[in-house]
């Protein structure tokens, strides 16, 4: 305590100031500014200056709204990984969407569609074909709920879908060529095969479906129809290996996988990772995917995006970032997959650059922000069945440096044919053949990619190995406009715009909800038109009944419970 004196108009006043000790980490720990960016207020969406800083070996974001005060949020769980990943920060060639022209300065994220500030073309476009779902998950904010005030049914017509495909294909310099059908549950659309055929007619080559897999489990022929129409991959929700962590489709997953085996559809497991809910099962998810590698070619973890109003304590309970997930995977795979095996998504840009320099044509690139996503490839040792990450037998860093160096030489005027032959000749030097999994010839695969100037030969890579990915979509608490402007996962909409994921879903009142409501009808109108009730499409848990039934949880056919117990040990 110390005394402070000041002179009032009448007399000298002495006040005692009590020094209140704040023992919080925030006060005692020093912070170091990394960079400045812009974000939004989670309460009013005002665009704010934001500071990204390091404290206690973690990366945080802080912003102050003049009305709603300061918001501080965990941005990246490891400063060391942030530094490593940031070395791959590159800008793409941009995207010129045909229907949105901004003559003056853009006020990002106010004018998404895409605007001239955007730095990445559409790597994967999403189209929402319905907001109906056959499940009623308590935590889901998206599906249409009958009886809810203002409830509407959003299902774009076939003509609207075709127009959206034309818009995507008109994007330059890289026409959109990869589409994800999403919802709701897309399989509820009776005309889903017609929609897929429209996409193929408009020259969209790669089509995958974001689904819970229940319809594939219940009706294999419906799955076959979708496959024959042109959808060759399922982006399959899979949040854990136990019924507690994955009540959504735990019992149905084995049957959905059986259907995919029979019809020739590949699968990507998509776990939404929530701290304190299912982050203890990440290793188990990978092991269950390993048991089904004949059909499951990837696992793409998505650290949760926190929607709605949440206090800081509640956010800290559930918030998990890419480095946190990667660290848990190392622990839960007993060090078979380590934190050093992961690279940020834009690390593959040198390969794109050398192909582009050789072909003298713009090529598909993954130029997203380094903090958006990460990945690694793993293989299975034939003898021990342990995981073998690609980094164990490939000097990936050296190979990327070679690609970047040779692309610069070609752009500087070197003979591109001689240069590419030199690249191919040197590839073998980066690969340890003794440690390379049997049946895999990585040097040959990269040589084919380079000489054919195409990624088509990557297919054999997926068959022999499994991709592990991370994609952390933003929310209002951690929105970073540096990331948003580099986003390459987009939505196509009936008003013929192409909108980045982290604008479309992060600010739904500006984008997703406003657009869908404009092109919707009431639930009652839909029921009258279709001659059915909305609740008729709900899944009644047919594969979960009867303790001794083959279709019951933990059925002998799939041995799901047995495999789940193995996966968690």
Task: Indicate where each model-derived feature is located.
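Radical SAM/AdoMet-radical enzyme domain recognition
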Residues: 162-180, 189-303
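A short, flexible beta-alpha/helix-coil linker loop
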Residues: 144-149, 240-243, 306-307
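Radical SAM enzyme [4Fe-4S]-AdoMet core and its adjacent flexible, acidic
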Residues: 2, 6, 15, 258, ...
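A short, charged
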Residues: 4-12, 17, 22, 85-121, ...
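Alpha-helix N-cap and loop-to-helix initiation/capping positions
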Residues: 152-160, 247-252, 277, 316-320
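C-terminal target-recognition/interaction regions appended to catalytic cores
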Residues: 445-567
